[in-house]
Design a protein with these regions (language model features):
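Short beta-strand scaffold positions
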Residues: 35, 79, 99-102, 122-123
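Noncatalytic, solvent-exposed loop/strand surfaces
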Residues: 18-21, 25, 49-52, 67, ...
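Acidic, PIN/NYN-like endoribonuclease modules and their adjacent C-terminal/linker elements
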Residues: 2, 106, 110-146
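Short, well-structured N-terminal submotif of metal-dependent ribonuclease cores
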Residues: 1-39, 50-63, 137, 143-144
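Short active-site oxyanion
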Residues: 1, 30-33, 74-76, 116-120
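Short, contiguous hydrophobic alpha-helices characteristic of membrane insertion segments
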Residues: 11-17, 75-80, 121, 135-138
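Acidic catalytic patch
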Residues: 40, 70-95, 102-107
Length: 146
């Protein structure tokens, strides 16, 4: 199984939050973890913002960013192409998604259609999770998540 992580899921692999343990276990069970190229900028920005907002966590967040940098080359990275962003635009319209959420969904769909292995989609946004289900994706969800 390939685990596709949107940015919220990717951050949970590096920053200890509710749900991190379950997601880390899922990532450990996967044959590969896939991400969209934009997840790099989004994840680094999220960690930097949190470090500014909670200065006491800055050192741990710097370490998390360094681990992300070290691990990045091990991920299956889906490139952002014209075809992908056009598909993302369709998904934004069809599923009422935010721009980058629709790009994440289109990237996951690209991996799913490549069909090398089953894909499981990990995210922490209910609307995005629902759209992935409509597209026939297996969705990672913690107990109690819709």
């Amino acid at each position: 199984m390939i685990l596709f992580c949107d940015t919220s899921a990717l951050v949970k692999l590096y920053v200890r939050e509710a749900g991190s343990d379950a997601l880390l276990a899922e990532a450990g069970a996967a044959s590969a973890v896939a991400v969209c190229r934009i997840a790099w900028a989004e994840a680094v920005a999220a960690m930097a913002r949190r470090a500014r907002d909670v200065p006491a966590d800055a050192e741990a967040l710097d370490a998390a960013r360094q681990r992300l940098r070290e691990h990045w080359s091990h991920y299956v990275v889906v490139e952002v192409t014209q075809a992908l962003v056009e598909r993302a635009g369709d998904y934004a319209d069809t599923f009422a998604l935010r721009g980058y959420d629709s790009v994440q969904l289109a990237a996951a769909r690209t991996v799913q259609e490549a069909g090398r292995e089953d894909l499981r989609f990990a995210c922490y946004d209910a609307r995005l999770r629902k759209a992935a289900k409509v597209l026939g994706m297996s969705v990672f969800a913690e107990a109690g998540a819709p």
